């Protein structure tokens, strides 16, 4: 079954329903009876779930007197975290639990010594935890192509179009009928700029290519392809260039922003931006910070073409080198993945929970999921998801950065989308 079908099934079900192990394990620690301290690395900035991370860690520490979790925020999203992890492991200072982005799954599997979660849960006396609480298709999000379970899905998100209904009304647009295609987005952005003086559109510019993948593949392009069994850049096509050029043209005519996320998101929250295309994971931050009613609609399509949106977010990996730390890490993961904790995480961010039945659990976020139209819409979007492209090999991080650099070149008008993507594909293929 294809990923978009199995993930759709997973989300429908969600609504209805002391041995040392692992690749990086090389020693045991004596059971001294002392408090075990573990590090939890994440990418949740204060404006993106940071407060919820602190709340969850504090709750866990209160209820687990023999374990102390120390959380550490890593800037620059998953690329920044992965680079920091690489440096830490090279110096022998492994963190214990890490939020790894789905786009770095292949890189992490091939370049890091990680703990085998199946064996780790077995050692903790709960070998059926994953099988009992997650559909096989959801677990696949954190599996390599050869079926290795290198982590446990934690956060799931989709890209959506947030908009300001008050700006829409001032511009003569209907808030109940937001843009459904990129042609309509372009026209609406220009109309907002011309009639209100506000900027019309902004697409997130994190240190990744998540929304850009959605853009490219929804127009019939692809991020990666295989040639003679080898992975190659697949975005050097007319379809990919045309998709990217849509956003570049909006920036060129002055109706869209090319800016940092902080600038773009703040413009939206302050009522100076009509539309922002970003993760549903920003829902809670937007709804809390805006003085207007935050509304969201599905990721726009290219004409009648079906949209293809990568499942964003992260999965949890364990890198503990000490048996007691490893055991504590598994205990912490079980807490983070509990219905109660997932409810707090989803409520505090906007991420969709991966565990079966959380939305129907009275300890889960059933009430919020039933009442919040933005959440309902995001859950329905799960029928369209594809896998987030992950560059393989030792040069995966460099390849990812080259494509990020291409985004800046295109949106700044230094080069056309066609030329920039062509040159970038050539560079990436040499690396891969």
In which residue ranges do the predicted regions lie?
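Short, low-complexity disordered leader/linker segments with a strong preference
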Residues: 1-39, 62, 123, 419-432
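Extracytoplasmic/periplasmic substrate-recognition and gating elements
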Residues: 62-63, 68, 87, 91, ...
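Glycine-centered hinge/linker elements that transmit conformational signals in sensory
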Residues: 186-191, 229-258
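C-terminal capping/gating helix-and-loop segments adjacent to ligand/active sites or protein-protein/ligand interfaces
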Residues: 310, 373-427
């Amino acid at each position: 079954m294809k990923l978009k079908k199995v993930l759709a099934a997973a989300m429908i079900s969600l609504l209805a329903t002391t041995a040392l192990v692992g690749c990086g394990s090389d020693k045991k620690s004596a059971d001294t009876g002392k408090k075990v301290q573990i590090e939890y690395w994440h990418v949740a900035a204060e404006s993106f779930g940071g407060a919820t991370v602190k709340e969850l860690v504090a709750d866990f520490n209160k209820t687990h007197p023999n374990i102390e979790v120390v959380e550490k925020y890593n800037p620059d999203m998953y690329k920044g975290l992965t680079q920091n992890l690489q440096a830490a492991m090279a110096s022998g200072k492994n963190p214990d639990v890490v939020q790894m982005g789905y786009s770095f799954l292949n890189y992490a599997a091939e370049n890091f010594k990680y703990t085998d979660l199946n064996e780790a849960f077995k050692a903790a006396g709960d070998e059926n935890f994953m099988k009992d609480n997650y559909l096989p298709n959801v677990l696949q999000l954190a599996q390599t192509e050869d079926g290795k379970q290198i982590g446990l899905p934690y956060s799931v998100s989709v890209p959506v179009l947030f908009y300001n209904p008050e700006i829409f009304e001032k511009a003569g647009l209907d808030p109940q009928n937001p843009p459904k295609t990129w042609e309509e987005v372009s026209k609406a952005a220009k109309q907002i700029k011309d009639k209100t003086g506000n900027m019309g559109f902004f697409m997130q510019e994190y240190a990744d290519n998540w929304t850009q993948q959605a853009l490219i593949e929804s127009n019939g392009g692809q991020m990666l392809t295989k040639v003679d069994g080898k992975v190659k850049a697949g975005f050097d096509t007319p379809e990919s260039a045309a998709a990217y050029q849509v956003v570049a043209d909006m920036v060129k005519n002055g109706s869209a922003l090319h800016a940092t996320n902080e600038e773009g998101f703040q413009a939206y929250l302050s009522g100076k931006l009509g539309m922002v295309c970003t993760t549903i994971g920003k829902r809670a931050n937007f709804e809390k910070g805006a003085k207007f009613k935050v509304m969201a609609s599905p990721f726009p399509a290219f004409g009648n073409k079906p949209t293809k949106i990568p499942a964003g977010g992260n999965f949890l990996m364990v890198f503990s080198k000490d048996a007691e730390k490893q055991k504590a890490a598994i205990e912490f993961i079980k807490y983070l993945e509990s219905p109660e904790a997932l409810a707090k995480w989803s409520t505090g961010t906007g991420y969709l929970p991966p565990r079966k039945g959380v939305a129907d659990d009275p300890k889960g976020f059933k009430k919020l999921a039933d009442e919040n139209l933005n959440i309902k819409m995001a859950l329905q979007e799960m029928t369209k998801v594809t896998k987030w492209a992950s560059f393989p090999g030792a040069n995966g991080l460099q390849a990812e950065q080259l494509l990020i650099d291409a985004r800046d070149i295109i949106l700044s008008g230094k080069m056309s989308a066609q030329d920039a993507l062509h040159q970038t594909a050539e560079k990436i293929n040499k690396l891969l």
